[in-house]
Amino acid sequence: MKNLSVVTQFILLGIPHTEGVETMLFVLFFSFYIFTLVGNLLILLAIVSSSRLHTPMYFFLCQLSVCDIFFPSVSSPKMLFYLSGNTPAISYAGCVSQLFFYHFLGGTECFLYTVMAYDRFVAICYPLRYSVIMSHRICAFLAMGTAVFGCIHSTFLTTLTFQLPYCGPKDVNYYFCDIPVVMKLACADTSTLEMVGFISVGLMPLSCFFFILTSYSCIVRSILQIRSTEGRHRAFSTCSAHFTAILLFYMPVIFIYLRPTPSPWLDATVQILNNLVTPMLNPLIYSLRNKEVKSSLWTVLHLLCFLPKHL
């Protein structure tokens, strides 16, 4: 007869096939994590401290920076903890929390990128009505809506995952608790969860991505009609930064959750790109080609580090 004792903790087995390089990975991922936190905090300070950047586009960029601070913080501290030689165990409640906040923040970012694409669509396709359509009230409503939908999405998935009984093996063949690896340990039929997870985690980002592509097809058409070369260049510069960030976010998600045959090592590698590298690159993507952000950022660095006021 099977042992039906309830699992009270899980063992995170980490990134597959990385035995012997834990110290190197710890230094690398810790550097990524620190750069992510510092970069996004600087973007936040740059936007908040400059009245010129108090517009809908930068308001949503602020929200993205907040998400990019917390998103890698869901899995990175625990991963760094066991890479430094500590216990890889995580409590049942800790596993639930990881899964919930990962999908809450991931879902919020997914909806937020869609809202940001809509903002650019209105700004470029309907410039005369932009201030009316994207009023402060509408922006606050959209920002709150992304978080609410992200929370509903995550609550639904977390409830479905952990209403299953876990009474057998407790080794999670991954570096954090996510649906595909946790549900393999359930002592019950997981076909319903697999189907719902595929629809929610796979098709939901795909639907948002198609909406974004539709918005950008309209944006490109409108940009090509701009007579001013400088105007076209500025519009393309702003939109290309946003679209680059979108690709870096959506491609790993679609790759991981819509691929029919999972590979633990490949999935973990792509997931790290999504969890650590993309949030680290976002501040660079949004600041390098944006003179206003760079100027405000330099002012913040001057105040913090006593650097020269001008480049």
UniProtKB/Swiss-Prot annotation:
It holds the Pfam family 7tm_4. Keywords: Cell membrane, Disulfide bond, G-protein coupled receptor, Membrane, Olfaction, Receptor, Sensory transduction, Transducer, Transmembrane, Transmembrane helix. PROSITE patterns: G_PROTEIN_RECEP_F1_2 (PS50262). One of its GO terms (biological process) is G protein-coupled receptor signaling pathway. Disulfide bonds join 95-187. It is found in: Cell membrane. This is Olfactory receptor 10D1B. It comes from Mus musculus. The gene is Or10d1b.
